A protein has these predicted regions:
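Extracytoplasmic substrate-binding proteins
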Residues: 137-211, 308-332
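Proline-aspartate-enriched helix->loop->beta-strand connector
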Residues: 116, 123-129, 147, 258, ...
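Basic- and aromatic-lined ligand-binding clefts that recognize polyanionic substrates
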Residues: 62-64, 68-75, 177-239
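A short, structured surface patch at a secondary-structure boundary
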Residues: 68-118, 131
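Extracytoplasmic ligand-binding site segments that recognize negatively charged/polar headgroups
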Residues: 87-91, 135-137, 153-166, 200-227, ...
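Structured C-terminal subdomain patch of bacterial secreted/periplasmic proteins
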Residues: 261-332
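C-terminal motif of bacterial Sec signal peptides marking the signal peptidase cleavage site
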Residues: 19-23
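Bacterial lipoprotein signal-peptidase II cleavage site
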Residues: 24-39
Length: 332
């Protein structure tokens, strides 16, 4: 995402800032509306910064985040420019790279700010920025280049269903967007049916453990928690009662208080394997029932990102990576 860089410190901040959604519904929210979205043009989409009108079918699309690129690619549209995923050596998350195939769009960095001149040089006729964390500073300049599809509230509060719907409408592919949403939701629901062992299992989810302590998800409105809920699991009641830290949807715990994390399954996402190993070897963590049973599921950075910044592409990838590990933990 635009707010992330490759350094370990900023990677940790990114994990801590994993999105907390305002609502999990798939339709457009009251503050973001679409008109003319049946496939004809012009199309209007209203978002945080006003109403964006797309006068005709776009042919040169620029994606200001890899999630926006995912939305376009899933709809069969290959952007001419894509913001780099800073944690990846080739600038692409694996699911994005797979969808691109042999296509090689221009990549650009959005670390710290959006590259206005580089975007302008791509001569876009549509800019997708539903997950652009720099947009508050760059919208006015970007909107002078081409119509900009934005978020309704914030890049981390619009659901993936809502963002996909707006991107699809702007591309004149509203019906395809609705089908993608339905198909992806059905795939998640099918995993729940296939893996009944997950239903009712409690979980806690630690993000960015350090030598000083950990942050843990304490909101069932967190997007990752919602995905797991869609599989039949539920966030541990013990962590739901923890006081929120300065990061929304996150509680902070010192290492000596890790016992509150015990649940049927413990998930841990970290920026490096070293951090994951350090958590697992902590004496208090080792004493947790879930860890002793083998119901401890470590997530590397890419896996955490796939469910923290969801798109139809990332979620389908995540199902192949996450569900088998959860199933094994549930049976431990």
């Amino acid at each position: 995402m635009s707010a992330r860089v490759g350094s370990a410190a900023r990677v940790l901040v990114s994990l801590l800032a994993i999105a907390v959604v305002a609502a999990c519904g798939g339709g457009a929210q009251p503050d973001q509306q679409r008109s003319g979205s049946g496939g004809g043009f012009p199309v209007s989409v209203t978002g945080k910064f006003g109403t964006t009108t797309v006068p005709e079918k776009p042919v040169r699309v620029v994606a200001m985040s890899w999630t926006d690129a995912d939305f376009a690619l899933a709809l069969g549209v290959t952007p001419v420019g894509i913001a780099k995923a800073p944690d990846s050596p080739n600038g692409l998350e694996p699911w994005t790279a797979a969808a691109l195939g042999d296509a090689k769009p221009t990549q650009f960095s959005t670390v710290g700010s959006d590259p206005i001149e580089q975007v302008a040089g791509l001569a876009p006729d549509l800019i997708l920025a539903t997950k652009d964390y720099n947009l508050g500073q760059s919208y006015q300049q970007l909107s002078q280049i081409a119509p900009v599809v934005t978020y309704a509230g914030a890049p981390n509060t619009d659901s993936w269903q809502q963002a996909l719907g707006n991107v699809a409408a702007a591309l004149g592919l509203a019906e395809q967007g609705r089908k993608l949403t339905t198909d992806t939701e059905a795939q998640i629901a099918a995993q729940k049916v296939t893996h009944p062992e997950l239903t009712g299992k409690t979980f806690s989810y630690v993000v960015a453990p350090t030598a000083a302590g950990v942050y843990t998800v304490n909101s069932d409105q967190d997007v990752s928690a919602q995905l797991l809920a869609g599989l039949g699991m539920r966030l541990s009641p013990k962590v739901l009662t923890l006081p929120t830290s300065g990061l929304p949807g996150r509680a902070q715990l010192s290492l000596e208080n890790l016992s509150v994390l015990d649940a049927d399954i413990i998930l841990v996402a970290a920026a490096s394997q070293q951090d994951l190993d350090a958590f697992a070897k902590n004496p208090v963590a080792e004493s947790l029932g879930a860890v002793r049973r083998g119901a401890y599921v470590p997530f590397n950075y890419t896996t955490a990102v796939s469910i923290a910044f969801p798109s139809t592409l990332s979620l389908r990838w995540a199902m192949t990576q996450v569900v088998p590990k959860l199933s094994a933990a549930a049976k431990a």
